[in-house]
């Protein structure tokens, strides 16, 4: 049975009875938005400094507010701050404690602002900081991939399409593919950050404020590149959070695909790589097991990131302007995506440099499955045969190989000439794995020379991050 909770609200003047206790708990967000305490205090200090600049506060009042906020920050970080559900959210908790500490001067802090523009500012400050940290983790992971690619620039493995052997590639080339995907992920976060880094503070509830606020000065204090140009838009939209979650879902999708490969490659059926013991776990019943828990969890956590994106899109799709209480539900999906990305990127950045490659196993796998069939077709084309005819000839040679249990390089010259008289002894030069990868010496190709060129370019890009 619901009860009513008495207690003063900072907005309580309009109401004739206290809030129902269940409703109070149901509508409170402090259990999760307290994460924003540093950003809330940072924004409040800048707001107070701006109010002093325009004459709404005296310098003495501003200093008193700053001292009070600094003391509250210290209390929170020591664990000495009692968060109150009755005060609903991080903003009201901090403001109430400020008034308790410094008296009526604290009541002036909220002049010219609303919780609507306040929370939008807090989220942007938080997300900007999170993006910067995530971009650094991406760079760290990319650095590990580049090191691994350089170490294995000439290591031959089977390249796959449809999870069937397709053509030989180098392991270094394969690692650089993941580098390139992460490079686009890094770029998407950098681009998203531009739209995050716009200040909504000063939009107030929805219509702006009659006070002579200097929004550009506040933006300068907080490191924002610009201020919002429409007060309704400033407080009501969360497209910047949706954009971040979309970029996050793509990052997790890339990590999930990479995870799937590592899980397969580490299995006894592939045996291509060995993952470090410290990134794996065992079985409670099967003593032989070494389970790739880190990539499996990253693969699984991708569902969270995808779900958070859909949650935010669904949250926003039916809202009229301007702010609605629905937007309280924006934080948990956003926070969860940040946490999921941070943990997954850290796990991969820590693990990748220590992956052990079983080069001989990969080479043996590449020598099976007719991986050089395309090379034979190209050989025939260079001797004047139309490609479609060459494709047909090689297809028949492959069928013969399947029937006899021989790979193309294992067939005799006489056997190969049964399919085309244009085949000569030099064909065996193109049917080697080394010859196949070396022939792909086009920009972006798998030839070791091209892989090393991409590694040099990547290192040049990563160098500022390492400096």
Curated annotation (Swiss-Prot):
Its main location: cytoplasm. PANTHER family: ARGININOSUCCINATE LYASE. Its EC number is 4.3.2.1. Pathway: Amino-acid biosynthesis; L-arginine biosynthesis; L-arginine from L-ornithine and carbamoyl phosphate: step 3/3. InterPro entries: Arg_succ_lyase_C, Argininosuccinate_lyase, Fumarase/histidase_N, Fumarate_lyase_CS, Fumarate_lyase_fam, Fumarate_lyase_N, L-Aspartase-like. One of its GO terms (biological process) is arginine biosynthetic process via ornithine. Gene3D superfamilies: Fumarase/aspartase (C-terminal domain), Fumarase/aspartase (Central domain), Fumarase/aspartase (N-terminal domain). It is found in: Cytoplasm. The keyword Iron-sulfur does not apply. PROSITE patterns: FUMARATE_LYASES (PS00163). One of its GO terms (cellular component) is cytosol. It comes from Thioalkalivibrio sulfidiphilus (strain HL-EbGR7). Keywords: Amino-acid biosynthesis, Arginine biosynthesis, Cytoplasm, Lyase. Belongs to the lyase 1 family. Argininosuccinate lyase subfamily. GO terms for molecular function: argininosuccinate lyase activity. The keyword Lyase applies. This is Argininosuccinate lyase. HAMAP family: Arg_succ_lyase. It catalyses: 2-(N(omega)-L-arginino)succinate = fumarate + L-arginine. It comes from the Bacteria. CDD domains: Argininosuccinate_lyase (cd01359).
């Amino acid at each position: 049975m619901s009860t009513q909770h008495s207690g003063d609200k900072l907005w309580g003047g309009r109401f004739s009875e206290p809030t129902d206790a269940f409703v109070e708990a149901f509508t409170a967000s402090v259990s999760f938005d307290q994460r924003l305490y540093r950003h809330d205090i940072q924004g409040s200090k800048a707001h107070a400094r701006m109010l002093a600049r325009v004459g709404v506060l005296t310098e003495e009042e501003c200093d008193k507010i700053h001292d009070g906020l600094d003391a509250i920050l210290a209390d929170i970080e020591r664990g000495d701050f009692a968060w109150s559900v009755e005060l609903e959210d991080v903003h009201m908790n901090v403001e109430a404690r400020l008034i308790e500490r410094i008296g009526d001067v604290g009541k002036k802090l909220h002049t010219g602002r609303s919780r609507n523009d306040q929370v939008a500012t807090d989220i942007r400050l938080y997300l900007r900081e999170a993006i910067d940290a995530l971009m650094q983790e991406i760079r760290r992971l990319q650095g590990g991939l580049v090191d691994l690619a350089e170490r294995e620039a000439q290591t031959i493995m089977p390249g796959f399409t449809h999870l069937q052997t397709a053509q030989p590639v180098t392991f270094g080339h394969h690692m650089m593919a993941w580098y390139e995907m992460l490079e686009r992920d890094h770029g998407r976060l950098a681009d998203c950050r531009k739209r995050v880094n716009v200040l909504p503070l000063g939009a107030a509830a929805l219509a702006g404020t009659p006070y002579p606020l200097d929004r550009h000065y506040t933006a300068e204090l907080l490191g924002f590149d610009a201020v919002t140009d429409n007060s309704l838009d400033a407080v009501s939209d969360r497209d910047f959070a949706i954009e971040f979650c979309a970029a996050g879902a793509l990052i997790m999708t890339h990590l999930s695909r990479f995870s799937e490969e590592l899980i397969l490659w580490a299995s006894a059926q592939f045996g291509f790589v060995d993952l470090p013991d410290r990134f794996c776990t065992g079985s409670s019943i099967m003593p032989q097991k070494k389970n790739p828990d880190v990539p499996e969890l990253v693969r699984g956590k991708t569902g969270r990131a995808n779900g958070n994106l859909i949650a935010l899109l669904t949250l926003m799709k039916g809202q009229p302007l301007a702010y609605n209480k629905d937007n309280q539900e924006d934080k948990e999906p956003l926070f969860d995506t940040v946490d999921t990305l941070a943990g997954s990127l850290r796990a991969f950045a820590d693990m990748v440099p220590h992956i052990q490659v079983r080069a001989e196993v990969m080479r043996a796998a590449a020598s099976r499955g007719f991986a050089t069939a395309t090379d034979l077709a190209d050989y025939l084309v260079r001797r004047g045969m139309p490609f479609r005819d060459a494709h047909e000839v090689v297809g028949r040679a492959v069928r013969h190989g399947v029937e006899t249990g021989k790979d193309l390089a294992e067939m005799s010259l006489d056997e190969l000439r049964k399919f085309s008289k244009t085949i000569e002894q030099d064909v065996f030069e193109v049917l080697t794995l080394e010859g196949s990868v070396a022939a792909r010496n086009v920009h972006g190709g798998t030839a070791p020379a091209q892989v090393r060129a991409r590694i040099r370019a990547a290192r040049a890009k990563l160098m500022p991050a390492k400096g």
